[in-house]
UniProtKB/Swiss-Prot annotation:
Homodimer. Dimers associate into a tetramer to form the enzymatically active phosphorylase A. The keyword Glycosyltransferase applies. Its cofactor is pyridoxal 5'-phosphate. The keyword Membrane does not apply. Glycogen phosphorylase that regulates glycogen mobilization. Phosphorylase is an important allosteric enzyme in carbohydrate metabolism. Enzymes from different sources differ in their regulatory mechanisms and in their natural substrates. However, all known phosphorylases share catalytic and structural properties. Belongs to the glycogen phosphorylase family. The record marks 156 as: May be involved in allosteric control. The modification N-acetylalanine is found at residue 2. It comes from the Eukaryota. It comes from Homo sapiens (Human). This is Glycogen phosphorylase, brain form. AMP binds at residues 43, 197, 310. Pyridoxal 5'-phosphate binds at residue 569.
Length: 843
């Protein structure tokens, strides 16, 4: 008689292996049907389009989950060094189509949905963007997660699950109005709550120094609930995890304070604790210094570090014996990348855990911390640097303040020993800034506490070394690196521009999707008549499609054979949307002056959000919409010039406008844009760039040849020279009649007849205190735009330059960026190993 199975033997039947994946169209249909009825509890008589979207999302998710589980099993067995990417922002956009693309499911799903009498594109449009970021910094984090999974790295993204992401922008009477982004209202099919890993985070309280060590007592506790989202690599069966924390009040929250019986009040007050993960702060490149924001920064750091240490100590969930208690090997198993200074508290928090909790001695703990952490700098604008008041730390994080003081003291002792008597250097390099309000300089803390510090484009990394962190570079030059940003070609070509991707695949195969340098193989085709025609045809189709979208969504009719001149990014003075406005007004004046002349027709599209408290940025939006109101309704102009403000610019709108663009505007003042990544997306999608020598534009010009971009304006050294000499806007105003005319029209109310003074603040700024020197680049910009017009009249020559740009965009893949981080900062090697899918036994 067969021996009865033990419980543990029986449990071996609980396996992902026996579960069928989506092999074909019939499987997709079956799974879709099952989810519609059993998961959503709907039939076809009552199902809404949103129900159909959710049924498809669950179908695709089923296919993903087996691979997700397999990947985690693989990491537990191999125990590789793990990469932790800490960011307060992950601007993911939509997930459905990206998941289908990366799993190779798009054709099967498309056909199955068609067979069911539905439209895949319509279902995709129902999904909310996950807008957990402001702009470039958050989108970079999302591209990096895609690349880390595609390169087979054991990587985790850690952030906050904001209940409300970046606000939705409405334009009302030409002004930006913010609306809350309730992106979770209908539920999120991609996330999985993990209450078993919920962790406590402490705030406030007091510090006690005892013979047994330091104790942080009488704290307020907030719980961090993790929500996991799968991040699939491209066709390699690797599925990594993005873990976002949500704040929960503990069950006894405030109840002890209300022993007089105000139970209801205590329960209502739970909201106060849970506000920590309520909303993303909508400031891009601006530091506000709010206590709730500091709480958010510590919340994500404290929860994440507990999680990292749990995973380091014990490889498997449910395994009761800690595998590792010695922290010597911690930096060999853990790399923490700080995405800007927002997660800077990782440094003092790791020190607190090592010294106070794990009883590691200070010097050893400091060595471990430095070897583990690395810091990416994203901005050189002084108003963006985080400088927290010491008084806020004293109250909120008293133990961390002590640790920061101790770190700073040792650091300054070291500097003083190397530069005796140089008191000014000590002041410049201190983490603590003295003054009326003592402040903690978080960037200095990051530089001191990390083994690697990187900028995000070559020119930016030079500015970081020569200016922002000059003293620190002199102290430890080997610490400073450059890692030029990149974008994922899966989302930013294959997903958003399938026509162009197919055209390229026909010529050079599919390898470029995971090795973008292969695009160089297109160079011999620059003069190929058929390829030129094919590329131009794809662009025209994209323009027609986007024109139809604009007509449907914005009720504006545009000329699809006009040049699509696109300027989309956060609205900020340094990005110089005002320079673009002056060009538009000048073009308008030229058409009015000589209506019979042949003009190259243009549709100028400007889009982006302004921080709600940034008066000048909001006024810039009003100016763009006001110029549009005049230009678009002038019968003399006709369809030769149109100005469109693209409302509520976000990832899903970028995916539509970028493939349709002819001209990409990247016109920040030289030395202000750290890198930019929009510039790379336009280049890859067949737009030509008009730009300054700033950020990654410099490297784009180097890769494609400066003659294949439209480069204009002051260089960094010219800007510095002008600063030394003193920038005088009036000189340009007096000597350039077209500039004077445009400024006078804005100033006099020509574009705002009902409110003649509407734009006085803009004109006053431009004339008297313009840090970003708009007038200084006006003449060069106008001349450069004339060259753009001239080339656009010759479609064949234009398309040749487009092909050359696409062929030379390989460097700007986030796969290349992440490979450099892996080898030069994290000390790991990318892997092309295919993890076996769930239906195949593991080795």
């Amino acid at each position: 008689m067969a021996k009865p199975l033990t419980d543990s033997e029986k449990r071996k039947q609980i396996s992902v292996r026996g579960l069928a994946g989506l092999g074909d169209v019939a499987e997709v249909r079956k799974s879709f049907n099952r989810h519609l009825h059993f998961t959503l509890v709907k039939d076809r008589n009552v199902a809404t389009p949103r129900d159909y979207f959710f049924a498809l999302a669950h179908t695709v998710r089923d296919h993903l989950v087996g691979r997700w589980i397999r990947t985690q099993q693989h990491y537990y067995e191999r125990d590789p060094k793990r990469i932790y990417y800490l960011s307060l922002e992950f601007y993911m956009g939509r997930t459905l189509q990206n998941t289908m693309v990366n799993l190779g499911l798009q054709n099967a799903c498309d056909e199955a949905i068609y067979q069911l009498g539905l439209d895949l594109e319509e279902l995709e449009e129902i999904e909310e963007d996950a807008g957990l970021g402001n702009g470039g910094l958050g989108r970079l984090a999302a591209c990096f997660l895609d690349s880390m999974a595609t390169l087979g790295l054991a990587a985790y993204g850690y952030g906050i699950r904001y209940e409300f992401g970046i606000f939705n922008q409405k334009i009302v009477n030409g002004w930006q109005v913010e609306e809350a982004d309730d992106w979770l209202r209908y539920g999120n099919p991609w996330e999985k709550a993990r209450p078993e890993y919920m962790l406590p985070v402490h705030f406030y309280g007091r510090v006690e120094h005892t013979p047994d060590g330091v104790k942080w007592l009488d704290t307020q506790v907030v719980l961090a609930m993790p929500y996991d989202t799968p991040v699939p690599g491209y066709k390699n069966n690797t599925v990594n995890t993005m873990r976002l924390w949500s704040a929960k009040a503990p069950n006894d929250f405030k109840l002890q304070d209300f022993n007089v019986g105000d139970y209801i009040e205590a329960v209502l007050d739970r909201n106060l604790a849970e506000n920590i993960s309520r909303v993303l702060y909508p400031n891009d490149n601006f530091f506000e210094g709010k206590e709730l924001r500091l709480k958010q920064e510590y919340f994500v750091v404290a929860a994440t570090l507990q999680d990292i240490i749990r995973r380091f100590k014990s490889s498997k969930f449910g395994c009761r014996d800690p595998v590792r208690t010695c922290f010597e090997t911690f930096p060999d198993k853990v790399a923490i990348q700080l995405n800007d200074t927002h997660p800077a508290l990782s440094i003092p928090e790791l020190m607190r855990i090592l010294v106070d909790v794990e009883k590691v001695d200070w010097d050893k703990a400091w060595e471990i911390t430095k070897k583990t952490c690395a810091y990416t700098n994203h901005t050189v604008l002084p108003e963006a640097l985080e400088r927290w008041p010491v008084s806020m730390f004293e109250k909120l994080l008293p133990r961390h303040l002590e640790i920061i003081y101790a770190i700073n003291q040792r650091h300054l002792d070291h500097v003083a020993a190397l530069f005796p008597g140089d008191v000014d250097r000590l002041r410049r390099m201190s983490v603590i800034e003295e003054g009326d309000c003592k402040r903690i300089n978080m960037a200095h803390l990051c530089v001191i506490g990390s083994h690697a510090v990187n900028g995000v484009a070559r020119i930016h990394s030079e500015i970081v070394k020569q200016s922002v962190f000059k003293d620190f570079y002199e102290l430890e030059p080997e610490k400073f690196q450059n890692k030029t940003n990149g974008i994922t070609p899966r989302r930013w070509l294959l997903l958003c521009n399938p026509g162009l991707a197919d055209t390229i695949v026909e010529k050079i195969g599919e390898e470029f999707l995971t090795d973008l340098s292969q695009l160089k193989k297109l160079l011999p085709l620059v003069s190929d008549e058929v390829f030129i025609r094919d590329v131009a045809k794809v662009k025209q189709e994209n323009k027609l499609k986007f024109s139809a979208f604009l007509e449907k969504e914005y009720k504006v009719k545009i000329n699809p054979s006009s040049m699509f001149d696109v300027h989309v990014k956060r609205i900020h003075e340094y990005k110089r949307q005002l320079l673009n406005c002056l060009h538009v007004v000048t073009l308008y004046n030229r058409i009015k002056r000589d209506p019979a002349k042949a003009f190259v027709p243009r549709t100028v599209m400007i889009g982006g959000k302004a921080a709600p408290g940034y008066h000048m940025a909001k006024l810039i939006i009003k100016l763009v919409t006001s110029i549009g109101d005049v230009v678009n309704h002038d019968p003399v102009v006709g369809d030769r010039l149109k100005v469109i403000f693209l409302e509520n610019y976000r990832v899903s709108l970028a995916e539509k406008v970028i493939p349709a663009a002819d001209l990409s505007q990247q016109i920040s003042t030289a030395g202000t844009e750290a890198s930019g990544t929009g510039n790379m997306k336009f280049m890859l999608n067949g737009a030509l760039t008009i730009g300054t020598m700033d950020g990654a534009n410099v490297e784009m010009a180097e890769e494609a040849g400066a003659e294949n971009l439209f480069i204009f304006g002051l260089r960094v050294e010219d800007v510095e020279a002008l600063d030394r000499k003193g920038y005088n806007a009036r000189e340009y105003y007096d000597h350039l009649p077209e500039l004077k005319q445009a400024v006078d029209q804005i100033s006099s109310g020509f574009f705002s007849p009902k409110e003649p003074d509407c734009f006085k603040d803009i004109v006053n700024m431009l004339m008297h205190h313009d840090r970003f020197k708009v007038f200084a680049d006006y003449e060069a910009y106008m001349q450069c735009q004339a060259q753009v017009d001239q080339l656009y009249r010759n479609p064949k020559e234009w398309t040749k330059k487009v092909i050359r740009n696409i062929a030379c965009s390989g460097k700007f893949s986030s796969d290349r960026t992440i490979t450099e981080y892996a080898r030069e900062i994290w000390g790991v090697e990318p892997s092309d190993l295919q993890i076996p899918p769930p239906n195949i036994p593991r080795d």
